Amino acid sequence: MSVPGRQIAQAVIQTIIAASGRSCGYATVPTSQSQPSGSQLPYHVLYELGQTVSGPPFGDPAADARLLFQVTTVGASPDAASSGADRVRAAFLGRTAHGADWLYPITLPAGYAVMGRELDREDGMTVAGSTYSYVQRFAVHVTTG
């Protein structure tokens, strides 16, 4: 099964915005018109890193997909980058008080459902000039719903 990566990515961006209260660009810096905070630091950038499929062979529509996303949080200070990354981590991994549901749902297009989420890799913080970046990779497991 191939899932619509761009549509899934847009749903993930909306989840990051809900959790962080900051703008998130799609493979680029958010524009000054991006909601809720434009291109002001801190902000997030989401990159699609591809998808793999599992389950039934030969492109069966009932197969599952694992989509990989990188989120780079950019801030003017180490604290801003780190706390922004904490909010992104909460967006992907946060659970409700009873642990039964995700704290921040990823609302997918009709016909798809999130089965799971995981932190794939956390590269941590780097600095270039006076700009700090914190890089994380997350996997989102999707099935037909």
Region locations from a protein language model:
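Generic alpha-helical secondary structure
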Residues: 5-10, 78-81, 85
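Small/polar-rich, solvent-exposed N-terminal microdomains that initiate assembly or binding
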Residues: 1-59, 95-108
